[in-house]
Regions:
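Gram-negative (and chloroplast) outer-membrane scaffold detector with strong preference
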Residues: 48-146, 166, 178-181, 217, ...
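Flexible, solvent-exposed coil segments and beta strand-coil junctions
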Residues: 20-27, 78-87, 146-155, 194-199
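Residues that define the transmembrane beta-barrel architecture of outer-membrane proteins
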Residues: 21, 36-42, 95-101, 117, ...
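Bacterial N-terminal signal peptides that target proteins for export
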Residues: 1-7
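Sec/Tat signal peptide C-region and signal peptidase I cleavage site
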Residues: 13-19
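Extracellular loop and loop/strand-boundary signature of outer-membrane beta-barrel proteins
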Residues: 28-33, 87-93, 154-160, 200-208
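Transmembrane beta-strand segments that form the barrel wall of outer-membrane beta-barrel proteins
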Residues: 21-40, 56
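Predominantly the C-terminal beta-signal and adjacent terminal strand-loop region
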Residues: 68-69, 170, 175-225
Length: 225
């Protein structure tokens, strides 16, 4: 809801101060350096021309959750001291996703921003929000004991955690504008998180997070006048 409201507000402000603005939407995937998974998702954005060859842009991306390939193990403890066994080992899989907010400047080479074929590139910044969730198995590692309701995880074994990071990067792409219709585009971004923090041990212990990641996007842009 926050992201949707932010886009609507930004769109209205841009319309109020400039006669031309572009909206875009598409799909793509994100891949962390040395990460075992690719995250597929969707994106939407706005682009505001400063002149025929230079624009400012903003984009929101949602890259859907993936699970770790290997299970991890946590220790759960009985809520009643008389329960036997008093502690159990339980396997779990962690899932991980990305929500991204990015903005930056694009410089077009070849034809103009709103005509023909051209390349573009520039620098950007990005805020990334990750949610880490643990899916615990219903029984312990032996398969003999159901633990939910009688046992509890430790204080540092929360079922959900979050990571917030700030990244700087570069983007390059190609686009072709069909007169009177719109623009198709493809771009690649390389981002490096210069600052990031997890709110608990669940967030900090995932192996799907990488400070260096690449985003590949394809989509359609419509110019509004």
């Amino acid at each position: 809801y926050f992201v949707f409201s932010y886009i609507c507000f930004t769109f209205c402000m841009v319309q109020a101060i400039n006669a031309q603005v572009s909206i875009s939407a598409g799909t793509g995937f994100l891949r962390g350096f040395q990460s075992e998974k690719s995250f597929f998702g969707i994106h939407g954005g706005l682009e505001l021309p400063r002149n025929n060859d230079v624009t400012l842009y903003g984009r929101v991306g949602q890259y859907f959750a993936q699970n770790e390939d290997q299970a991890s193990t946590a220790l759960v403890t009985a809520q009643d001291f008389t329960t036997v066994p008093y502690q159990l080992q339980v396997n779990y899989f962690s899932s991980f996703n990305y929500t991204t907010l990015e903005g930056g400047t694009r410089y077009y080479i070849g034809n103009d921003y709103d005509s023909g074929f051209s390349g573009y590139g520039g620098s950007n910044f990005m805020l990334a929000f990750n949610t880490v969730k643990r899916d615990y198995e219903k029984t312990d590692i032996t398969g003999m004991y159901e633990w939910e309701g009688q046992y509890q995880t430790g204080g540092n074994e929360e079922t959900e955690g979050r990571i917030i990071s700030f990244a700087l990067g570069l983007q390059g792409g190609l686009k072709y504008t069909f007169p009177g219709t719109g623009t198709v585009y493809f771009d690649i971004s390389a981002q490096y998180a210069i600052a990031g923090v997890g709110n608990n041990e669940t967030a900090n212990n995932t192996n799907l997070y990488s400070p260096l990641y690449f985003i590949f996007n394809v989509g359609f842009r419509k110019d509004l006048y």
